[in-house]
Amino acid sequence: MHTTDTGTLPGSDYYFHTPSEDAKKFFYYLVSCGHYHTINGYSFHRDFYPYMLFLYVKGGMIRLDYMGNSYQIRAGEFFFIDCQEKHFYYTPENCEFYYIHFDGLNCHQIYPLIYKNFGCLFHQKDYPELIQILKRIIYINREEQQITEA
């Protein structure tokens, strides 16, 4: 689905899923995903959203305020946050990024351990397979008619 969010450019798209009760109970599951092209000044603020966010910056830069810290995420980097915490991000320049919101199993219980030991900012060169999986998830949602949970 093409987005009309303020600050997004043509070619931006996103997809939502409604997982089954079994998926919620037993799996990690996709909630939404997308590929955005944005202009300088695109921003997003939430006090609470019940899902996890994995966002990869392909081009440009995003500034993120999260857990009392400010981060600059540049091309080739990604952030991973628990959106149950207040967060704000914006693009101080044109930007291209991919994202997924997901949930399930013990996401919110294990995240504090990840954040404590590694923070929320990572580089693609350290996790190239994650970026390929992210792009594949978005491609499947864009091109395939039916998505299964299996």
Label every model-predicted segment.
Residues A23, F44, Q124-Y127:
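A generic helix-loop boundary/linker signal
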Residues Q109-A150:
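Amphipathic alpha-helical segments enriched in hydrophobic/aromatic residues interleaved with Lys/Arg
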Residues M1-Y29, I140-E143:
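A short, N-terminal "cap"/entry segment at the start of jelly-roll beta-barrel domains
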Residues E21, E77, E85, E93-E96, ...:
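Glutamate identity and glutamate-enriched acidic tracts
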